[in-house]
Amino acid sequence: MSDRYELFLTCPKGLEGLLAEEATALGLQETREHTSAIRGSADMETAYRLCLWSRLANRVLLVLKRFPMKDAEDLYHGVLDVEWQDHLESDGTIAVEFSGHGSGIDNTHFGALKVKDAIVDKLRTPDGERPSVDKINPDLRVHLRLDRGEAILSLDLSGHSLHQRGYRLQQGAAPLKENLAAAILIRAGWPRIAAEGGALADPMCGVGTFLVEAGMIAADIAPNIKRERWGFSAWLGHVPALWRKLHDEALARAEAGLAKTPSWIRGYEADPRLIQPGRNNIERAGLSDWIKVYQGEVATFEPRPDQNQKGLVICNPPYGERLGDEASLLYLYQNLGERLRQACLNWEAAVFTGAPDLGKRMGIRSHKQYSFWNGALPCKLLLIKVTPDQFVTGERRTPEQRQIERENPVEVEVVERKLNKNGNPIKPEPVVVEQARLSEGGQMFANRLQKNLKLMGKWVRREGIDRYRVYDADMPEYSLAIDLYHDWVHVQEYAAPKSIDPEKASARLFDALAAIPQALNIDKNRVVIKRRERQSGTKQYERQSAQGQFLEVSEGGVKLLVNLTDYLDTGLFLDHRPMRMRIQREASGKRFLNLFAYTATASVHAAKGGARSTTSIDLSRTYLDWARRNLSLNGFSDKNRLEQGDVMAWLQANRDEYDLIFIDPPTFSNSKRMEGIFDVQRDQVELIDLAMARLAPGGVLYFSNNFRKFVLDENLSQRYAVEDITAQTIDQDFARNGKIHRAWKIMARA
């Protein structure tokens, strides 16, 4: 065998340039970059060194042979020609990985079988002994890549992927692979910062991958020093003495590195369930003396190194997966930006994000950006110098002013910490930092919100209302409905039509979400966002979240429970406020029937108004339980019936009479507990006829729905005394949207 070998090193997409620099520094020659890989030439010592020291590679492949290939037979004979007895015992184990397609092979499993067959046939002994397949821990892992008619046959020297360092046995929901984390640290300048004695802090550390990789770099620990089994361990070409020499050198370097004064490396994680797994990972890496992890929110993040040294803040914020995550992610980035500006002045920061647009919401400019891939997700690494000239705040500076600031950076005096009488540091007064500046669109949106607040202010105060709609798609480009619930904000985003560029729609949403807390003077953690779109099947009733957090609100002398997070609607239709108040005024001494009752808020008002009895019918057990809580909250119980059932079937079976009936049906509904599908336009006549049959003489039926295209059937107007009262049932906060609902008063003709 030759003294030099062709090597292929694979890596995550986007790391090729960094890996080429690292591999060249470790001795690889004639280095060339490919997609998700590099190649070069090296002797065996360099090949071993790459396995041991590469922080960025996935695998180190030693090329055995290249050969042209036209079909499966060429593949078989090309592999068969290799002197496999120089590489593997006849009773050894193999695993074959095949990549690429063409030359008559479009199935990688078939290609791998042909490679395996050739190796087995070559090594089969006269007495029938032959290699067997072990896909988990083989003696030899063989890789064949088919590239434009050429087969490249290699041995995998690494065995399992090199990103598996052995310390991370516990991980969070969205982990970074260790070699990607190392690449981000290298791009962020951590090797330089660590060599200068700088600190590192991760405000969203998860299970500590950034922390451990940073500690290994700072302590000069080979990333794979603890690996016991390699792809070359049972390879007949392995040179154990050479490997032991390199491994002993790495052990000596690690011992010397750990003997140094430890770098100040700290992680903070809001989820208490991840704290112990993170500490366990750190302990397995042997870095417990270097790295500490604490529970803490981003909003209170403040790194306090022992020697007041500056350093690097690095983090990988979570990716939004659930409906409504946009708001929480936006405010997370805003909080991060605020903490950087307030607590990390003159530090460097590196934010690895799958949502680069959110990175613009931190209120700090990035001076460099790098593209990476986290699996199949394109990501950006934003590098930031946390200095005042990079802050994006309310004050707009000219390019000339920014140039002056760059040429004359602000000097920040480092003040020695004062201690209290117990010898503990006295926490300094927080630095006052301006809020991040809203975009032009965001400021325009904020102005509209404040204008609406001012216009409704007198009415709100006069009526004693603190739950009302402050914005309802007033500006077409900001298609939101925004409701105030005292000191909470409930935001519903109307799904953008397909003709709207998704990136523009997302940017406008972020502009609006950034503006809402400032314009309404509301804590950003009390903003809840949902997306409202056409629902199908039972989705209109499905749970969106599972927080189970109910708020108590008051209206017209009654108390009601709302839930802003768990369902698409909150349990209280604000637009029906006037209708509920009308029912309360008219209910005294009457038998009240509430059909499609939802959470029975109208029944609570009827009971408050002195109704002789209330009966509420709904198909959902969840909403009826909610209704029971609403009634109990107000001390109403015995005379108020709650029945689960299909309204149409219930009306057909019921023979009781009612003096006051309220019907507010959905546009459509289907369920396993009902026959067929209810459609309000189609079924209105049958529904109202059935309800009118239950109306006592002199009684009143109120019918309402929010189907914008609804047309009341003319037969109903001929049969009953029908009055359109829509205008009387819409308050000032919904006056901008006259089609929010339609309402009619229906009575028997005299």
Curated annotation (Swiss-Prot):
PANTHER family in the cross-refs: RIBOSOMAL RNA LARGE SUBUNIT METHYLTRANSFERASE K/L, RIBOSOMAL RNA LARGE SUBUNIT METHYLTRANSFERASE K_L
NCBIfam families, per database record: PRK11783.1
State a GO cellular component annotated for this protein.
Answer: cytoplasm
- UniProt-recorded name of the protein: Ribosomal RNA large subunit methyltransferase K/L
- Asked if S-adenosyl-L-methionine is a keyword of the record, the answer is yes
Superkingdom as given in the UniProt entry: Bacteria
The GO terms describing molecular function are:
23S rRNA (guanine(2445)-N(2))-methyltransferase activity; RNA binding; rRNA (guanine-N7-)-methyltransferase activity
Main subcellular localization, coarse class? cytoplasm
Decide whether keyword Transmembrane is in the record.
Answer: no
What SUPFAM superfamilies does the annotation carry? S-adenosyl-L-methionine-dependent methyltransferases
Pfam families cross-referenced by the UniProt entry = Methyltrans_SAM (PF10672), RlmL_1st (PF22020), THUMP (PF02926), UPF0020 (PF01170)
Cell location: Cytoplasm
Q: Which gene encodes it?
A: rlmL
